[in-house]
UniProtKB/Swiss-Prot annotation:
This is DNA-directed RNA polymerase subunit alpha. It comes from Mesostigma viride. Transmembrane segments: none annotated. Keywords: Chloroplast, DNA-directed RNA polymerase, Nucleotidyltransferase, Plastid, Transcription, Transferase. It catalyses: RNA(n) + a ribonucleoside 5'-triphosphate = RNA(n+1) + diphosphate. The N-terminal domain is essential for RNAP assembly and basal transcription, whereas the C-terminal domain is involved in interaction with transcriptional regulators and with upstream promoter elements.
C-alpha cells in the first residue's frame, strides 16, 4: 500500500526569500508520494514551469531618427542596439493578455531607467532601477514600444511578421518568468509506509512569486490531463463501432436472401461473406461469370436495405 492510498499529498513552502527585485526564490516540499511517483511529479512540474508559464516583454520599439538597430542618436551614450538590449531585459508584471503600448519622452541630461517608462495602468515595471540609457546636454529620447505576452523566447524576426509595425525595430523577447527549477527526490523512512517526497526549488524574475508560479503550474498539469479523463466513454463507443463492423463482415451472403441464380453465382466466385462481397465494386459484379445486370442490382439493393451498405460503382 502506498502513502497516497492513506492520505493525500500536501505542498509545504519551507523557504522563501527575495534575493533581488528580479530574483525571487522558493523551496517547496511535496509529500507523501508513492515510490516511483517522485520523479514523475518533479520532472512534470519542472517542464511546465520552465516552458508553459506566460510572461510579458517588449517585442518592438519605434524611435524617431532610428532607421535600424545600428543607428546612433545624438547626445545619447548608447547606440540604438544597446538601448534595445537594455529594453529586452526589462521585466513587467501584468494580468492582461492583450497587446499593450508604452511610451517614453525624456530630455537630458539624465540617466534613463525603467521607472521613466509611461505604461498602461494594467502593467507595471518590476524593477524601476533597470538601466536603459544616459542622455547628455539637451538630448531627447522618444520612443513608442509594444508589449506582448507569451511563453518561452521569441526571436525578433517573429515580431516583425506578427506585428508589421512600419519603422518599428524588433526586439528579442524573453517571456519566461521562471529563471530556473531544480528538484530532488528523497525516500521518507520515518512514516509507517515507505514513501517519497519531492523538494522543488524555483527562481523567478520577480513578475510572479515562486508559490504563485507553482500553483499555476499545477493547474496547467491538471488542465492538460483532465480532458483525457473524459475520453474513456468516447473510446468505448468507438470500440463498439469496431465490434459492429466486425460482425457485419462475418455475415454470410445467405442473410441477403438473394435469388437462387444470384446466390449460386456468388458462391461459384468464392464470395461467402459480406466481407468477401465488399471487395467488389458494382462494375466488378458484372464481370462475374453468368452474373447479369439484374442479379447485380438485386445484390446492391439487398445490401442497401438490409445492412445499409452501399457498394461503390467502381474501384478507386
Amino acid at each position: 500500500m502506498s502513502g497516497n492510498d492513506l492520505f493525500p499529498s500536501t505542498i509545504y513552502c519551507i523557504e522563501s526569500k527575495i534575493e533581488s527585485p528580479r530574483n525571487l526564490y522558493g523551496r517547496f516540499l511535496i509529500e507523501p508520494l508513492a515510490i516511483g511517483q517522485g520523479i514523475t511529479v518533479g520532472n512534470t512540474l519542472r517542464r511546465i514551469l520552465l516552458g508553459d508559464i506566460e510572461g510579458a516583454a517588449i517585442t518592438s520599439v519605434k524611435i524617431p531618427g532610428a532607421n535600424n538597430e545600428f543607428s546612433i542618436l545624438p547626445g545619447i551614450r548608447e547606440s540604438v542596439l544597446e538601448i534595445l538590449l537594455n529594453l529586452k531585459e526589462i521585466v513587467f508584471r501584468t494580468k492582461s493578455l492583450d497587446v499593450q503600448k508604452g511610451y517614453l519622452s525624456i530630455q537630458g541630461p539624465c540617466v534613463v531607467k525603467a521607472a521613466n517608462l509611461q505604461l498602461p495602468t494594467s502593467i507595471e515595471v518590476v524593477d524601476g532601477g533597470q538601466y536603459i540609457a544616459t542622455l547628455s546636454g539637451n538630448a531627447n529620447l522618444d520612443m513608442e514600444f509594444v508589449i506582448n505576452t507569451g511563453k518561452g523566447y521569441q526571436m525578433a524576426d517573429y515580431a516583425i511578421k506578427k506585428n508589421s509595425y512600419i519603422s518599428s525595430l524588433p526586439v528579442d523577447a524573453i517571456f519566461m518568468p521562471i529563471h530556473k527549477v531544480n528538484y530532488m527526490v528523497e525516500q521518507d523512512h520515518t512514516s509507517k509506509f515507505l514513501t517519497e517526497r519531492v523538494i522543488l526549488e524555483i527562481w523567478t524574475n520577480g513578475s510572479i512569486s515562486p508559490r504563485d508560479a507553482l500553483d499555476i503550474g499545477i493547474k496547467k498539469v491538471i488542465d492538460l490531463f483532465n480532458p483525457l479523463h473524459h475520453c474513456s466513454s468516447e473510446y468505448s463507443t468507438n470500440k463498439n463501432d469496431f465490434s459492429t463492423e466486425s460482425k457485419i463482415n462475418d455475415i454470410l451472403v445467405e442473410e441477403l436472401e438473394l435469388s437462387v441464380r444470384a446466390y449460386n453465382c456468388l458462391k461459384r466466385a468464392q464470395i461467402h461473406t459480406i466481407s468477401d462481397l465488399l471487395a467488389y465494386s458494382q462494375e466488378d459484379l458484372l464481370e462475374i461469370k453468368n452474373f447479369g445486370r439484374r442479379s447485380a442490382e438485386e445484390v446492391i439493393e439487398a445490401l442497401e436495405k438490409k445492412l445499409n451498405i452501399y457498394l461503390p460503382k467502381e474501384k478507386y
